[in-house]
Amino acid sequence: MHIYIVNGGPGAGKTTFENKVREALGEHKVFILSTIDPIKDMAKRIGWNGVKTPKDRKFLSDLKDLVTAYNDAPMTYIKDELRFINNLYRTYDVSPDQVVVFIDIREPQEIARACKELNAKSILIRRPGIETASNHADAEVENYTYDIIIENDSDLDNLFAQIKLFLLSIKVDSM
C-alpha cells in the first residue's frame, strides 16, 4: 500500500489532486481518508451544519485537539480504515501494493507521527494567495518538511502536469 499524508491550506487543491489521481488509477485503487472525518461526524451530532467558515474551522480544529488528547480517536480511525483496506484486498487475493491511500492531516506533529507509524510519505499542496488561517492547524501548514511539494500556482493544466509526474513516481498500474 502506498500511503501519502496530504496537507495544504484551505482551497490549495488537495481534493482536486486526490480526485485526479483516483480518476487516473481507478476508484478501486485510491482511497481518501482524513483524520478530521470522525471529528466532523461528532460535530454534526452536536449541531454543526457542515459549513466551513473560519469560526467552524477553528471549532473543528479545537475539537480534534481535545479528542486526540482524550483518546487518539482520529489516528485510531485511520489505522482501522487501513486495516480494513488491507484485509479487503487480501480477501480477494489482490496485492495491496497496487493501492494508493491519501490521508489528509493538518497538524505537523500528527503528520510526523503518521509518516513514522504508517510508513507514509508527506505531500504539501501549495497555492499562493489562499485565505488566511483561522486556527492553528491551518496556520501551521508550512511548519513541516514535506517529501513532495506540489505547487498549484498556475492553471489546472499545470496542476494536471504535476499530477502526471506524481503518477510516474509511484509504481501503481492504472486501470
Task: Label the predicted regions.
Residues 23-32:
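Post-Walker A helix-loop "phosphate-sensing" segment adjacent to the P-loop in P-loop NTPases
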Residues 9:
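P-loop (Walker A) phosphate-binding loop of NTP-binding proteins
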Residues 1-4, 98:
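Pre-Walker A (Motif I) flank of P-loop NTPase domains
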Residues 14:
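Conserved lysine of the Walker
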Residues 17:
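Hydrophobic positions on the alpha1 helix immediately C-terminal to the Walker A/P-loop
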